[in-house]
Amino acid sequence: LAKNADAPMSPASTTKILTAEIVFRAIVEGRLRLDDSAPISPRAASEGDAESGGSSMFAASGSQVRIDDLLRGLVVASGNDAAIALAERVAGTEEAFAALMNQRARELGMTRSHFANAWGGGGPRQSVTARDMARLAAHVIRTYPQFYPYFGQAEFTWNGVRQQNRNPLLTMAIGADGVKTGHLAQSGFGLVGSAIQNGHRLILVLNGARTEDERAREARRLLEWGFAAEGR
């Protein structure tokens, strides 16, 4: 089922799926380890602090955080600070990481997507399609079974702040196990989600919901319809 699958849309924080993929790949290739640490630069901290209004894992500027914790902060808490810290650790600068993201997107066949940063900030230079994001999600699920469970973690605590995973599907009894939500004022509430029932996996991409509740309702409705169709 597809509607406007190739129409451009803002990925918002679903961008972080690709950020995570690049980190997973670096770990698999031996260029990075989960126990390695990354510094939290002033830039990373400022994009995730309360004043910025962005999502944050609340990593302190100047601190060192393990890659394992940054990944949890990235995909569970949707931390912009985690995304920037990982980008700087892998590529040196955000700009270099964005170039790496676009190279990787092309390698994965995401031909209609373009990324400007690791955390999903708005703007015309940050654009994807639903089809491309579904392709990315399927790749991550298939290629990194050892890392995919990060996306299904229910909560994450850092600096004394406990945050729930924002994926509404995870609390529904429909077999959901990932992937990532996104939201920007100009593009609404979005979700890349996945669930598995009776050995059948479905991947869902939706965007433009007006509220969190609408996003949750539509996501559930579409997955339930999909599984019912699979069973026919």
Residue ranges and their predicted role:
Residues L1-R131, I141:
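Active-site-adjacent loops and short helices of periplasmic peptidoglycan-processing enzymes
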Residues G62, T93-R232:
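Penicillin-recognizing serine hydrolase domain
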